[in-house]
Design a protein with these regions (language model features):
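ATP-binding N-lobe of GHMP and related small-molecule kinases
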Residues: 1-40, 58-66, 247-256
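Alpha/beta catalytic cores of group-transfer enzymes, especially the acyltransferase/condensing modules
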Residues: 66-116, 191, 205-207
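Short, structured patches in soluble enzyme cores that scaffold and shape functional sites
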Residues: 93, 115-125, 246
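Anionic-ligand binding region
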Residues: 98, 102-108, 126-160
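Glycine-rich, charge-dense phosphate/pyrophosphate-binding loop(s)
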Residues: 161-256
Length: 256
C-alpha cells in the first residue's frame, strides 16, 4: 500500500514548502487517491510529489513559479531515490514532454508531441523494483566514446521532439544503451517483447523509468494494433497489463 506519514514522498515536499515560505506554523493533512501503480516504473512517487507541491501552492496562494514547484517536488523524489531528480515531477506538473536541467530545475523546456500514442506494458508485480535499487545496479561511469554517442542520441531525441519527427523520436527512444542492457535483466522477456512490438509497427520501445513496466510509442491509431499483435505473439497477460493511452498535456491541476 501507500506509505503513510513521514515515509510518504508528500511529507518532505510539505516540509520544504514550510521552509520555503518561512512559515512553520502550518498543518495540513494529505489524502492520496492513487491512480498510478506503485513501484512499477511509472513515476508514482513523482506524481504524488508534484500534486502535493501544486496543491500547497494553490491552497496558500503563494504564487510559486513553475521552476520553484519543480524544485519543491524534487525534494519528494530525494526521499525515494536518495537524491533529488526532476524528470518525473516536471512532466507531472507541466504535462507534455519536459526536458529539465538536473542541476537547476528552474531551467527547462516543454514540448507537446502530436499524432502520438503510447502503449503501456504494466507489470502486475506491484512494488517489485525501486528507483534507488535500480540506480545502484548501474555503472558509476562510462567511457568517452559511449559518452559521445549518447550526446548524439540525446541531440537526436531533442531535435525529433521539437520537429515532431516521430520516426527519429522512436529510434532515439529505442536506444537504451548500458542502462537498458542492465535493467532488462530484471524484466521478464524484455527483448522478445521489444522485438514483437517494433515488428508490429511501434516506432520506439524501452523500459519505463526504473522498470519493470515498458512502453512503446506509435503513430496515432496504431497503438491497439501493436497491443493486439504482441498479445497474439506472446503470452504476456499473466504478468503484464497492456493498455493504449496518450500523453497528458495539462499536468497537475486543481479539480475542486
Amino acid at each position: 500500500g501507500i506509505p503513510e506519514g513521514k515515509l510518504n514522498v508528500a511529507y518532505p515536499v510539505i516540509e520544504s514548502f514550510r521552509r520555503y515560505i518561512e512559515y512553520n506554523d502550518i498543518k495540513v493533512e494529505v489524502y492520496i487517491d492513487k491512480g498510478v501503480p506503485l513501484g512499477v516504473g511509472l513515476g508514482s512517487s513523482g506524481a504524488t510529489a508534484a500534486a502535493t507541491a501544486v496543491a500547497l501552492n494553490e491552497l496558500f496562494g503563494t504564487g510559486l513559479s513553475i521552476g520553484d514547484l519543480i524544485a519543491l517536488a524534487g525534494e519528494g523524489e530525494r526521499a525515494v531515490a536518495g537524491e533529488a531528480h526532476y524528470d518525473n515531477v516536471s512532466a507531472s506538473i507541466l504535462g507534455g514532454i519536459v526536458i529539465v536541467n538536473p542541476k537547476n530545475p528552474r531551467e527547462f523546456f516543454r514540448v507537446e508531441p502530436h499524432n502520438l500514442e503510447v502503449v503501456l506494458f504494466l507489470s502486475k508485480s506491484r512494488g517489485a523494483m525501486k528507483t534507488r535499487s535500480m540506480r545502484q545496479v548501474l555503472p558509476r561511469g562510462i567511457d568517452l566514446s559511449t559518452t559521445v554517442y549518447w550526446n548524439w542520441t540525446v541531440s537526436k531525441f531533442t531535435r525529433a521532439l521539437i520537429e515532431n519527427d516521430l520516426k527519429s523520436l522512436g529510434e532515439a527512444i529505442s536506444e537504451g544503451g548500458i542502462v537498458e542492457e542492465i535493467r532488462a535483466r530484471y524484466v521478464d522477456s524484455y527483448w522478445e517483447i521489444k522485438k514483437a512490438a517494433l515488428e508490429s509497427g511501434a516506432l520506439g520501445f524501452n523500459i519505463s523509468g526504473a522498470g519493470p513496466s515498458m512502453f512503446a510509442i506509435c503513430r496515432s491509431g496504431q497503438g491497439h494494433r501493436v497491443l493486439l499483435e504482441v498479445k497474439r505473439r506472446m503470452n504476456v497477460e499473466e504478468y503484464l497489463e497492456l493498455l493504449v493511452t496518450s500523453i497528458d498535456l495539462h499536468g497537475a491541476r486543481v479539480l475542486s
